[in-house]
């Protein structure tokens, strides 16, 4: 053994050495073992809550932050964007706690099977009308409400139900109380109690979805936070696993569990192949109409929604915004055509032409019920006849200017085939 080590060892065995060392070390009376240790433990727990957080998807979160900090945009819009990111980041510890409390307190929810019916197609083709119409038949379907997508925690949803708060909270509009917010609300009514599409979950929880582009309308950002299939496969599966659990939690709250989970996801078709792998018996309702009609309506809604979420900012003031969105929608439509022709089994997809739904809701729903093997009851028919009458006379409260967009020829051929197939 080294002589220096022996000398040190011998020296430290002298009583006076230990006395000096003990005086310099913290005792039970020092702040480190009280306030200091408490702070250390609290910091460790805080860091663990971020490390184990189920949400958000941090790479997308930091890309949003980077674009907000580096790309030009009016100050008011950036303030709203920063507010969203602050809420998203500050709420992580609480959301982590609630997520794992669900796992601890309600493990039975994971045993509930999910048999989905996915409404896909393109936005502004009547998918909200169809989704909410079918969701009202709670004996046959269950859907997820906006409030449930935003707070996918049984430890939140159960107290809301017990205290009777859902009606109060559900009456809150998603849209701001501004002129452009009211316009967006007329185009797409959205209260927290409304049945809403799955994209709300991916936007609010993971910061990775087409919808997040409406909050952060930087043209170069769209490809980054929109494409699901470009994510690592492990990340894709993680997102869909948590999406599956969020659906199971809603099913857990149902006393009489309906047969089908009713999904609406009309803006993220590149996740469909993996969904088909995870749910091999899933059914797909493909609802579409001509590109000139859905694109004209979509552009108007996107402008209103983006402006409402960004302090009145007009996205068309950026010359790159419209071409980027148009290219994205062309690619999405091409993807949809490929899915219908080459990916989705013929017996698992039902093509619907939107004008048929608008003209005759009962006939369209009866066709869906027959395809799914569900009983179409007389009471439901009568309710739908009345709904269809109201649909014909309702005042939308807005008008869209029709514009023809090039690059949708293959998609429009698919629309024509759906329209022809529906004719007697």
Label the model's feature ranges.
Residues 119-138:
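Glycine-rich phosphate-binding P-loop
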Residues 93, 97-119, 149-152:
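N-terminal signal-anchor transmembrane helix
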Residues 1, 5-95, 225-240, 251, ...:
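PAPS-dependent sulfotransferases, especially Golgi type II membrane carbohydrate sulfotransferases
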Residues 252, 257-281:
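Flexible, glycine/threonine-enriched loop-and-boundary segments that flank and lead into catalytic domains
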Residues 120-122, 262-266, 288, 354:
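Short His-Asn-centered micro-motif
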Residues 265, 275-300:
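Conserved phosphate-donor/acceptor-positioning beta-strand/loop module used by diverse small-molecule
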Residues 149-261:
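PAPS-dependent sulfation machinery
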Residues 137-147:
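Post-Walker A helix-loop "phosphate-sensing" segment adjacent to the P-loop in P-loop NTPases
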